[in-house]
Swiss-Prot record:
The keyword Membrane does not apply. This is Dihydropteroate synthase. GO terms for biological process: folic acid biosynthetic process; tetrahydrofolate biosynthetic process. (7,8-dihydropterin-6-yl)methyl diphosphate binds at T51, D89, N108, D172, K208, R244, V245, H246. Pathway: Cofactor biosynthesis; tetrahydrofolate biosynthesis; 7,8-dihydrofolate from 2-amino-4-hydroxy-6-hydroxymethyl-7,8-dihydropteridine diphosphate and 4-aminobenzoate: step 1/2. It comes from the Bacteria. Residues 1-256 form the Pterin-binding domain. One of its GO terms (cellular component) is cytosol. Keywords: Folate biosynthesis, Magnesium, Metal-binding, Transferase. It is an enzyme of class 2 (transferase). Mg(2+) binds at N11.
Length: 272
């Protein structure tokens, strides 16, 4: 049975939209990492630069390379010994390499290699996995899904040319990155087209504006977990291989049940 991977979010920033400042100290971050492991997480994604809604595109100028290193490396050093896969959410190859040297095995690049062209070479050198997220300034010359597919497949091809195997390249449709609500609805409805590329797909909707708008009511980020879980279920039905979430326990339980139901359906169809 194919297991949906649960990627737990560990933001070590003071300003992330959902949990900024909660895990800013190493001790707090380690405590949360242990909690997620107990809750069944498959991958812990450590991030040192905010991508909160409305955050400026010049975040790489606001948070220096040195500051990102100072936020991320002590946490990675403290948790990489645990029996769980560690990912680092960064668009800088220098941060990626420093973390990969410590034993990290996945890089989650919100700019899909577009910000730092050396990212693919670094990830390839260490035999790691990479997540490529659809991003941009929101201006596009073709419909959103078509533009997303062209952009992500172009970057995935560059990653493969750099030596990263096909099955180690994850595609993230970029919910929460510059898209209108209608464009995000279109992307969600057509997730199967991204799945059809045969790259593993990671869905990252957790607590985002899209979830708030889907609920059609004012809500704090922590009040959006059940609606996030609905997108997890929907994504699994569409064929995504992983989900990036804040509430690990809820989504782990849901994903286990969805995986069982999908496997049950598959077996019965192939018995008949």
């Amino acid at each position: 049975m194919i297991k949906t991977k649960i990627m737990g979010i560990l933001n070590v920033t003071p300003d992330s939209f959902s949990d900024g400042g909660q895990y800013h100290s190493v001790d707090q971050a380690v405590k949360r990492a242990k909690e997620m492991i107990d809750e069944g997480v498959d991958i812990i994604d450590v991030g040192g630069v905010s991508t909160r809604p409305g955050h400026k595109e010049v975040s790489h100028k606001e948070v220096s390379l040195k500051e990102e290193m100072n936020r991320v490396l002590p946490v990675v050093e403290s948790i990489v010994k645990y029996d769980v896969q560690i990912s680092v959410d960064t668009f800088r190859s220098e941060v990626a390499e420093a973390c990969l040297k410590l034993g990290v095995s996945m890089i989650n690049d919100q700019w899909a290699g577009l910000f730092d062209s050396n990212m693919f070479n670094v990830v390839s050198q260490y035999g790691a996995e990479i997540v490529l997220t659809h991003n941009g300034d929101g201006h596009r010359d073709k419909p959103v899904v078509e533009e997303m597919l062209v952009s992500l497949l172009a970057q995935a091809n560059k990653a493969e040319l750099a030596g990263i195997p096909h099955n180690k390249i994850w595609l993230d449709p970029g919910i929460g990155f510059p898209k209108t609500r209608e464009e995000e609805n279109e992307v969600m409805a057509r997730l199967d087209e991204l799945v059809a590329t045969e790259y593993p797909v990671l869905l990252a909707t957790s607590r985002k504006r899209y979830i708030k708008e889907m609920m059609n009511q004012d809500s704090s980020p922590s009040d959006r977990d059940e609606a996030t879980a609905a997108t997890t279920a929907y994504g699994i039905m569409k064929g995504v291989r992983g989900v990036r979430v804040h509430n690990v326990l809820l989504n782990t339980r849901l994903a286990q049940s969805m995986d069982f139901l999908k496997e049950n359906e598959y077996e019965r169809h192939h018995l008949s």
